[in-house]
Structure formats: structure tokens, C-alpha cells
């Protein structure tokens, strides 16, 4: 179960088990959804409309983009930036789930958990994700740069990317886009955790448990639903974050169409509104929703699966 549960205390996992389950969950999920992530980033960074009628648009649909990336860059392009992305996922998953379990237990002990469970999961989910974000944000910037570049590559590997970015743009380059990231991640993760719990309760109400082992399917479906809900509400901030993260990297984006430079969060928002309209804030929403559904579904699925596995191993050892 995700979050502290006093009734299930006898089968609670240790802090190490929670961290490992979160890390493995992040690792497996990232490997599976990386192609959608690459397509989503390409859409978010494209200035032109995502429309077949626009002759200047390099990408205008999920399948068209996938086909073009495959033809121009080969299948490995769908895992561009995968090494930093995996470092990001492993570290993020460990910190997020460990912080969430600790925070929900803290609220339970303060008698604030039982009567406000949706709010408790929202706040704890947001705070745990914020903590994880501050920990791994430099890796997220590296992942975005590596996934966004075309051919020929500006950075051939992770080490070269770190060295070049630090030398040409300074140490603060690794925290580009941090403000919108933190602003976006709190409600996004908060909704992920709170909606996940609510959807599981709704699932049990619609399909009462009959003793059969259907928990894994329930975790997957409810995770997918919570991912779609949370991403829909917070997507514009995700787009803003991605565009800020590639600031100073415009020369590597020239092959993809128009490029823009932004002085900050407000300047970016104004430029997008003026040039692309409100729909500009939702570029790449389709692959992003697909990714959010799969990534959140798999995240909770694998996390609960490994937590249960650790519990079974400990029970067998007794």
C-alpha cells in the first residue's frame, strides 16, 4: 500500500525496502516509456504549430514524429539521454516514495491523516516530489538537453555534456527551469498520490473484492487514471520548464525549425501567448498524456509489487 497504514503495520516495509522499491519502479518505468518522452520533448520545444497544414512544422503527430525520428536518427534516438534519465528516475523514485511514506506517518501521528486523507496525500505527495526534484534537477536538465539535440550531436555523451555546459554556461545552467518545475511538480505529484488513493477506493466500490488476486491490475489502472488527471491540470508548466531548460542551446535546435530565446518565466509565457496562442501551452499533450498514464500506472504498479515482494521474502525468512 502507498502511504502509511496503521492497520497494516505488521507488513510495513523498512526504509531501505521503500527506497529500493521506489528506485526499481523508476528504473523499469523509465525504460518502458522513454520513446514517448523523447517525442513529447520534441513537441514541446517546437515553435511551429503541430499541424500537417503548416509546411514549416517538422512534427505534427505522434506516429509521424516517431517515423521521422526513426528514419533520420535511427531507433537509438528514442533512448537519447537515457543514461541521465535513468539516474534521474532511480534517484527520484527512491527519494519520493521514502519521503512520502515518512510524511504520511508523521501526519498520522499528529492525528491529521484519518479525517483528511485526500488532502494529506495531496500535500505529502507534493512535498515528497518537491524534495526529490531539488535532489535530481541537474540530471533532468542534462536529460532534456541530450533528448532535444538532433544530428550532428552537440554532446556525444553525458560527461561531455556536463563539461561543456559548465564551461560555456556556468554552474547555474544545471538549475535552469527549476522555478516552474517546483511550481508544477507540487500539484502534479499531489494529484497523482491523492487521485490514486481515491480511484482505488472507487474501484473497490464498483468492483468489490471477492478474494481473487486482482490487486496488481487495480494498481495499474488506478495509476494510469491518476496520471492522466494530474498531467492534464499541470501540463502548461511542464512545457514552460522544458523550454527554459534548453535556453542557451538554441544552435542545436536549428534543424528542428524556429528557435527562441527567453529571459525568464514571464517572458516565455508572453512570447508563447503572442506567437502560439493558448494552444501553444498544450503542445505535445497527446504523447504526454500517454506517457503520464503509462508512467504513473507503472510507477505505482511496480512500487507496490516490489513492496509486497519484500514483505513475502521477510515472511518466508521467519
Swiss-Prot record:
UniProt topology in membrane: Multi-pass membrane protein
Taxonomic superkingdom: Eukaryota
Protein location: Mitochondrion membrane
Gene Ontology molecular function: any one: antiporter activity
One of the GO biological process terms: thiamine pyrophosphate transmembrane transport
GO CC terms in record: mitochondrial inner membrane; mitochondrion
A Pfam family the protein falls into: Mito_carr
Keyword Membrane: yes
Listed InterPro entries: Mit_carrier (IPR002067), Mitochondrial_sb/sol_carrier (IPR018108), Mt_carrier_dom_sf (IPR023395)
Membrane-crossing residue ranges in chain numbering: 19-39, 87-107, 122-142, 173-193, 220-240, 293-313
Reactions the enzyme catalyzes: thiamine phosphate(out) + thiamine diphosphate(in) = thiamine phosphate(in) + thiamine diphosphate(out)
Keywords annotated in UniProt: Antiport, Membrane, Mitochondrion, Repeat, Transmembrane, Transmembrane helix, Transport
Summary of the knockout phenotype: Deficient mice are embryonically lethal, with death occurring on or before day 11 of the embryo development. Knockout of Slc25a19 causes mitochondrial thiamine pyrophosphate depletion, embryonic lethality, CNS malformations and anemia.
Solcar repeats: 13-106, 116-202, 214-309
Function field: Mitochondrial transporter mediating uptake of thiamine diphosphate into mitochondria. It is not clear if the antiporter activity is affected by the membrane potential or by the proton electrochemical gradient.
PANTHER family attached to this UniProt entry: SOLUTE CARRIER FAMILY 25
Family listed: Belongs to the mitochondrial carrier (TC 2.A.29) family.
Name of the protein described by the UniProt record: Mitochondrial thiamine pyrophosphate carrier
Originating species: Mus musculus
The encoding gene: Slc25a19
Amino acid at each position: 500500500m502507498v502511504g502509511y497504514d496503521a492497520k497494516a503495520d505488521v507488513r510495513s516495509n523498512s526504509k531501505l525496502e521503500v527506497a529500493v522499491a521506489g528506485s526499481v519502479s523508476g528504473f523499469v518505468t523509465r525504460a518502458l516509456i522513454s520513446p514517448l518522452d523523447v517525442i513529447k520533448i520534441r513537441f514541446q520545444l517546437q515553435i511551429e504549430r503541430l499541424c500537417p497544414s503548416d509546411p514549416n512544422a517538422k512534427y505534427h503527430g505522434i506516429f509521424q514524429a516517431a517515423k521521422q525520428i526513426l528514419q533520420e536518427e535511427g531507433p537509438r534516438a528514442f533512448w537519447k539521454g537515457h543514461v541521465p534519465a535513468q539516474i534521474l528516475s532511480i534517484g527520484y523514485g527512491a527519494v519520493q516514495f521514502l519521503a512520502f511514506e515518512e510524511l504520511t506517518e508523521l501526519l498520522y501521528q499528529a492525528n491529521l491523516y484519518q479525517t483528511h486523507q485526500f488532502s494529506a496525500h495531496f500535500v505529502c505527495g507534493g512535498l515528497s516530489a518537491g524534495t526529490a526534484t531539488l535532489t535530481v534537477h541537474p540530471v533532468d536538465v542534462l536529460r532534456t538537453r541530450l533528448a532535444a539535440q538532433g544530428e550532428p550531436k552537440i554532446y556525444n555523451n553525458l560527461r561531455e555534456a556536463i563539461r561543456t555546459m559548465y564551461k560555456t554556461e556556468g554552474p547555474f545552467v544545471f538549475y535552469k527551469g527549476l522555478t516552474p518545475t517546483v511550481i508544477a511538480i507540487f500539484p502534479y505529484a499531489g494529484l497523482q498520490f491523492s487521485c490514486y488513493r481515491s480511484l482505488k477506493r472507487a474501484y473497490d466500490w464498483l468492483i468489490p473484492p471477492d478474494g481473487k488476486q486482482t490487486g496488481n491490475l487495480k494498481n495499474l489502472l488506478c495509476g494510469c487514471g491518476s496520471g492522466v488527471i494530474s498531467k492534464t491540470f499541470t501540463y502548461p508548466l511542464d512545457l514552460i520548464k522544458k523550454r527554459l531548460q534548453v535556453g542557451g542551446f538554441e544552435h542545436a535546435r536549428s534543424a528542428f525549425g524556429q528557435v527562441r530565446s527567453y529571459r525568464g518565466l514571464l517572458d516565455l509565457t508572453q512570447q508563447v501567448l503572442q506567437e502560439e496562442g493558448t494552444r501553444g501551452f498544450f503542445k505535445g499533450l497527446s504523447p504526454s498524456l500517454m506517457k503520464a498514464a503509462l508512467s504513473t500506472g507503472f510507477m505505482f504498479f511496480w512500487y507496490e509489487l516490489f513492496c509486497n515482494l519484500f514483505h513475502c521474502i521477510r515472511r518466508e525468512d521467519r
